[in-house]
Every structure is written in structure tokens, then in C-alpha cells.
């Protein structure tokens, strides 16, 4: 019966049951109610699985008191330029910058402190606009940001901190960035460099590589075929290195070809009236049976369009469990053409080291069967399960098939070391003594996918043929460098995504039926080299040929030019986005002449390289401020007794501050230079890390530039405790403890023989040797420890139970 048809007392009974105490109701066999069930669970939230289960039934709701504005009514009465603070927080950054320039900047000279605050506010807003995040609002939850957006937000914090002599390491900052904004990002990174900082950037974007001062190429291949320095030097000369794949693509010797013919859609999935975030009653047709790219600048509505509109509504349509609320739509027509909609992301497949490519691809069972069929295995009665490292008697008894042991390092991070018994093979000696074609099962798991494919392809037999067929799929998706026994939790995001695509192809082989799935991929080019993209595009073509539909959110021009169909959203991000700019083949997108995607796609189709164009960079006004080079420039210091001091302290030299006691030396050195340097460095750190550090007071100054991260060495006049020593202060004692814990050898206090630990199997072998040597051993269990007294009754009790002997003070009785 529907909820709306129930009477009020029936609803109350369902919700609250027959009483207030759910435990008492349960014991009496009465209904404890839905609320009682959750009350029972809330009392057991100390258990992890209970907290995870409860999280499925929780959602965020707007506060009924402030209605999502976060402030009390009294605070809402204060306004600037006719707007309250929550109203400003809901404005996009580009609009907020214009508002500040109109209403706040003209009044900045009214107060010295206000002038500094306005300058800092404007600089951060300008930086956010510069790196392509002008569509974000300041009240936007960081939980909803993509990895690339979070990294660029952090980059603006680094720019605002004005640090120098700092090493910044960036991991693919162009993730989620449209080619329009790449030049802006490069300009921002160049400004960090000009301030005396060093940048190390992990990146595959062509324009970023060409804009680098030094390009380091690692390789030449992946996995075991990589790990070498192929090239280090000017980007323009990498093309001279024959073995460099990067050089081959940058020099034009090798290119990803434009498809000669593009597939025509068979049917369409018609979406009407879709609304979510900046999507407002969007109408669009998604072609089926082809490779479609969903493009647009950052914040144009691509991810909500694919995930919230299509994927979540597909779950509802197919009757699957949907833990998130799907986007509102008027209608979606064409579901009958699809069997399933799958979101293929880069999240880890598993988090345990026990799953491997061989297990995930379904070849490990076949490999174990082949070893169980050998003469040695049959003679010993070994079944396929004996060759499993996840269970059974064949795995190493010490590490239980893990191949490594976790070593706790106390105040340092824990490390994993190779198991000393199996030496990382995961198996016991009995399994490792079984050979097939000169290899035991540990040798096979140590082979790469490519080597194993070559090995099993040369063999005859149905099992070897099935193994080779499945390994061939892994090879085709570009995972030939993985070893069969590599733990899946060590794979990169791109490798995880390709392995998931391989699983779809493998399932197709196993079932033999051609199902029609829509596969949604959000920026699969993340972390991929040109050569990896070439391999992935071949997988896309194979999936489409099997009848699947691919909807790929991507900014990389190599993907867009290879697509059969393009849906371009925009034209801008945030409130300026959410509209369909153009649809059609890549050539039709270029011919339409609308939006930014067509402009950059034209260059790619014509074969022109992607380069950094300073004209595309929006340089903030704050970037033109006069910043002295080679010095820490302090202006307007009024902290404590300082009288508006201006001072330039040269970097890389020793500067001595002197003067009478109380003249302001410590205020200048510690309260300004040290405190401000540490505070700015802490600002660059994540909010989570900052909560564990002391927040220093911001000094009363107008401006301080050219400041590196700082360390203070002070005179501490307080006496340490009785346990404080030079060793504890210098941390020598902590490292000595760790040294003895890891390398110390225990010795018997009586005979001086070294004491060592033994595994269960080693103890069994030792007992067996002693039995052979002495003919018999007595196994004794303690009955009384550390107590004096008469225990004749205890001896008679033991005799009555059938025990043969009692030992008292090491004397047999």
C-alpha cells in the first residue's frame, strides 16, 4: 500500500513501533519501528561497517533557521553596496571581481588596513579568473570540485602567498581545463617562476611541455621497460632523440591520425527539459552506437549532463539502487535501445593487494588448473586450489600469500618489506617445487602480460588458448607492461580505467552475446601520454564495433578529433554555460564557428601544434606590481613599537639586526619575517594539515614580498623536564630506539646464543628434528605460576585425568 494511502496512526506505528526502547521491543517480539531501528544503529556507531551503512541513509538538507545562508539574522543586516555577505558568496568570481572594483576599490583609501585587505582580495579573485575558475562561487563546496579544479584553487593560494625560493610540485594541473584556459594557467605558473620559485610539473599537455624551460622525458616504455632518463633539456631538441616517444609526437614524426570515415548514429537518446546546476531545461539528442565527445569550457555543465542526467536517471529507469538524486528531466526517450549504462571512472578497482590482473581478467583459475595437471602435482594430490595465494595450504604460512610484511615504524610511516620466508613469491616451498615448462607458478605471476601472451600463444590446448585470448585483450588496451601478479591497488588511475574497459570486452567474450551498453567516461585522457591515447582510441573503436555507445567527457583535442560526434556545451562556465553550442562531427563543429572548442579544433584538424600563446593569457593587474628582486621587501611595518619601517633584506646573504634591548629587533625578525613567512607557507598547505599547526598572528604591515618559507631558532629559557635530554631534543634518541628495534639482536642471558623468531612451519620442523634425536618429548602446560603452596591435590587431580607427569620447579614427578 502506498505511503500516501496510510492513516496517520499507521504511519506512526511504522515509524515508531510499539514502544520507545527498540532493544526492549525486540526482546519482547514487538515491532520497534523504523526510527527504533536507526536508534539501535546509532548506539553502535563505534563500528566502521555500521557508520558506512548509516551513511547510505543520510543526506544534506538546508538549515531551516538560516535557509542555507550560514549566518545569524543579525549578521545579515550588514550590507555593502546593497548586498549582504551570503549574496556575495553566491556570486561567480568574475562577477564578484567586477562588484569589488565598483563598490569597494574606490573606498580602499579610507583606511590603511582596508587598502591592504582589498588588494589581497582583488589579487585572489584575479588569480581565480586567470586560471579559468571565474565561474566558481565562493560558497561552492570543495566536495563538488574536480581534482583539476582543486589543484588550480590551490595554485591561486600559492600565487597569493607571494612566496619565493620554494619548490612547487604540480600533478597535471591541466586536468579538466579547456584549451582556451591552458595559456592562462601557463602564465600563472610563469609568474610563480619569476618570483624565484622552482616548478616541477607532471604533465602530458602539449602546450605546457613546449612552454617549459627544461623537459625531462622518462621511459622509453612503461613498467619494466621504463624507469630510465630518456632526455633532459630544451623542449625544442627532444625530437632529436630517436627512442623518445614524446619527441616523436612533439616533432611531428608520429601523429594520431584523423579517422577517414566517421560512423553515423543508428538511434538517439532524446533528453528533454533537463535541469541540474547550470543546466536549465536542456534539450539534447545523444547519438547511440557511436563514439561521442562531450566538450566545453570548465564549468559548462558537462559532468552534470553525463552523470546526473544520463547515468543516475538510467539507474532509476533500470530499477537499480541509486544513492544520489538524479537530475530533473521532463522525459528521456530511447532507453529501449540500451541494455545498461555504465560509468567507467579512474577510481581504484579494489583496495586490497590480493587482487591481481590475472585474477581480475579470469586467467588465474586456468593457470592454476594447468599446474594442477602436471605429473608432480598429480603425484602429490595437489588440486587447483592448492596453487592459490589467497587461500588454501599452498600459500606462504608466514605472510599468508601477501608476499610482504607490514613493519610499523613508530613515529615514521609504516613500510612493507619482502617476506623473509617466501621472498615475495607468496607461496610455500612445496608449491614452488612444481614446475611447468621450466617455470613455477611464482615465475608465471612475475611475467608481464606481453610475455605471458607470447608464452601461452605458443602452446596448444583449450586452456592455453583461453588464457591467450584474455591476455590479448589486456595487451590491446595498453596494459602489456603489467605483471600478472601485480597488486591492483598499485595501479594508476589511467590503468584502472583501461582495466575496467578490458573487463567489459572480456565479459563480451565470455557471454558470446552482443549487449548494447552506454559507457560514460569522464576525462579518460587524464595521466595518458600521446602513445597511451592512441591505444585507448583503438579500444574505443573496438567497443563501438561491438555495439556499445561511448559518451566521453574530454578536453584533449586528440580525443575530440577522433570522435564520430561532438556535443559542445557552453559557451562559458557557470551561469554562462549549460547551453548546447553546437552538435555534429568535428568538421561540422569547426564549420559552425561557435564556441571555443571549434576554434581550437580547427588548429588540430589542420595539424598545427598546440603552443602557449601569451595573447590568450589574462594577466591580472596585481601581477604588474613592482616587486624588488633579490630582497625581502618590507613596507609600512607598525608592529609593536615599529614606526612605519621600510626595509629591504637581501636574500642569500647574512643580515644582522642589532640595537638596544626593546628597540624592535625581535619584533622585526620573529614577529614579522618569521611569523609572516610561516603563515604564508601554512596558507599553501591544505586546510586539513593546517588544523594541526599553530596559527601565528598576522603582523601589522602594509606589504612584504620576496619572502621564502621560514624557520626560527630561538633561545628557549624554560627548563626542560627531567626526561628531556640532548638526545630527545635533537631526536637522536628516537632514531636510536628505532635502530635498535629494527636491527637489534636479542641474546640469551644465560648462554649468550642469539635469539631469533621462527615461523609456524619452522617450529614444526624443529620439533620433528628433536623427536628424531631424543626419541620423545613431553609437552607441558602451566597450571600454577608465581605462587607458593602445597599442590598435592592438584597432582592427584591430574593423575585422575590421565596425565602421565607433573613438573615442579623443573623436576619431573
Model-derived regions: residue spans:
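Conserved phosphate-binding elements of NTP-dependent enzyme cores
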Residues: 1-812
